[in-house]
Amino acid sequence: MRSTALAFWVVILLGGCTTTLPVASPDPLPAPLEARRYQVAIPTHDGLSLAATVYQPALASGDTAPVIIATHGFGGFRAKRPLSIYGQTMLTGEAAIAAWRQGYWVVFYDQRGFGGSQGDVQLMSPAHEVKDVSSVIDWALRHLPALHTLPDGRAAIGMIGESYGGGAQILASIHDPRLAALVPIATWYDLADGFAPNGHVRSQWGAHLFTLGSLSSGFDFGMALQRPFRSAFTGTLSREAQTLLREHSPSSFCARGEYPQADALLIQGFRDSLFGIEHAQANQSCFEAGGQEARLLAIQGGHILPWPIQPWSGKPLFNTDAVLGCGADAVPLPELVVQWWDEKLRGAPRQVPSFCAALDYEQSLHLAALPSNGETFAVRDASLHIPFAGMFEWLMVPVDVGGDIVRGFWQGKDLRQLRPNGGGGRPKFVPVYVVERDDEILLGTPELDMRLSGTASRASTRVFVGVGVQRAGARRVQVVNEQLTPLPHKGLHRQTLPPVATPLQAGDRVGLVVYGFSWQYAFNPSFWWSRARLQGELTLPLQEGLKSLPLELATP
């Protein structure tokens, strides 16, 4: 009985142990390898260890394979097995597992401070998390046999990760030339600007990320409570905190002429309410400035807040499109990622386009680049009450739906044309354009040149602006891609807004939408009752017919 019990506990204990591997031989494989996975502990540069799962591909004698390094987003964890949350529901895991099944090595590791890895979370510090990527590369080159090499003699190494894991690979590539083919998903160019545009914190995201980070790191996420970052709890980010976040961003390195040294397939979402398409565009420019190739798949999904803040589209907090129609047929996103690696790491023919944009979850366009043209309209008077305009907008959904049903019984029901509405308890909407044809789209980067005035003090006059669409026959005004930008004070505001993409139909009204309160920025509004007014110009990226664009519409 004792021997049976002892054997049971030995099996249990060994089941949680990591595999100890010998140093890999540079000679060809003497025998075939079977597909399997095992757990390892990877030593870091500063004496800690990172928990990782190695996926070993099936290889015949004499075969070689590239290696993919995969890692997770903030508060996440690695895919320990194919049948797991990350392996089945996250693009990082889906693509990594698909690559493994097609003959790639995969090393999927927990970032320091998360999951089974040691250390404290340092918010992608170049001296910590970024160096950890090099430690993983060192380990892979030392322990994985039969690694494929590129024509220049380097090992064929790719990487993938979303959000926090996307930042890891871009920053690591700036410092380590051994990475060859990256797939950064929904990540940042300027972390301060993403987390706090115009200095105002996306407080909903702050709350969710703080909770996830605390839980996944065993409540060891102390950086958020340090002095520079405590300002975030007030709704604004101090200059010191902004400086620290920028030091952990590609923007600071690119500004100094330090660029990534790998090619990249950037995947970013129009509806991403944390890091919009503009971050991918800036990262793309940084890669290209350093002489590297960077392609962009502009999907719809990414960081998506739970309903009712953003419409439901899948998993809460983070989800990506299942497929993207960049050509005649729709292709699953994991397959596009593997095609990218096949081209860059195995020398396969090119299949992934330079740019593809999803107009919604059903239609996409294969273009040369995101259109840069726009049409400018005057906005003469956008007046609203702060903070009430938009505060209870989600409660009005059934009222709007019921009103649309009743309105549908009358001919000529939709004769409002360019008449503004809202501004009291509802968001202010100032339509400036009525869509004429069913083949028009809104695709590109809006711009505003406006003066914000009001009855309160300079700092207490704060609004949130975006591009609105009021569909023909409907009362409700939709914020295109749910992209709202804070205008933090009185004065002149000249800036671009996040890029948007949406199909339009005849009779739709497009214009400026202004909120006095937004649940995306729940801590930020001025809670002192006042009136605000916007006047100036709005430039909309209206495309006046799909036939005028470089390539045709592709429908999955």
Model-derived features with residue positions:
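Glycine/threonine-rich phosphate-binding loop and adjacent beta-strand/alpha-helix elements that clamp
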Residues: 21-24, 36-41, 348-556
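Catalytic histidine neighborhood in serine/cysteine hydrolases
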Residues: 287-312
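Short substrate-entry loop that stabilizes the transition state in hydrolases
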Residues: 61-65, 70-102, 107, 112-116, ...
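Accessory cap/linker subdomain of secreted extracellular hydrolases
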Residues: 89-95, 101, 130, 142, ...
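Short beta-strand/loop motif that positions the catalytic acidic residue
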Residues: 260, 266-268
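N-terminal cap/lid segment of alpha/beta-hydrolase-fold proteins
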Residues: 25-63
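Alpha/beta-hydrolase active-site loop
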Residues: 124-145
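Short alpha-helix in the alpha/beta-hydrolase fold that links the catalytic acid
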Residues: 276-286
